[in-house]
């Protein structure tokens, strides 16, 4: 079974070509993020604005030793300073296991705070 995470990321139009190059160079990345209609997860284009990319992966084994995960993480690490054009959010099974990077669409892609509803 293994430890699972929920991952979402978005890339603004200025960096999309660079991410598409990562996809083109790695079949494993393409397989990981291909869109699955049934589960409403994977890659989507033009979700927030024309030319952007959004990826949602629910209940995934997001291990940094996996080649496809490493390639995606490298892309975000390389563009960390261009943080207005990227957004990466990951939450693990443990609620304190979270990663957040970038500000693109930060008002729509975020981890809600746990709270009591009544």
Where do the language-model regions lie?
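Short, extreme N-terminal segment that most often corresponds to the first beta-strand
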Residues: 1-27
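Charged interaction segments
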Residues: 22-118
């Amino acid at each position: 079974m293994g430890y699972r995470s929920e991952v979402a990321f978005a890339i603004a139009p200025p960096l999309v070509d660079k991410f598409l190059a990562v996809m083109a160079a790695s079949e494993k990345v393409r397989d990981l993020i291909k869109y699955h209609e049934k589960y409403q997860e994977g890659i989507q284009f033009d979700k927030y604005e024309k030319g952007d990319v959004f990826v949602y992966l629910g209940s995934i084994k997001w291990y940094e030793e996996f080649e496809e995960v490493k390639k995606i993480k490298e892309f975000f690490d390389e563009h960390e300073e261009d943080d207005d054009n990227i957004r990466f959010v990951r939450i693990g099974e443990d609620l304190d296991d979270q990663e957040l990077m970038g500000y693109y669409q930060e008002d729509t892609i975020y981890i809600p705070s746990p709270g009591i509803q009544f």
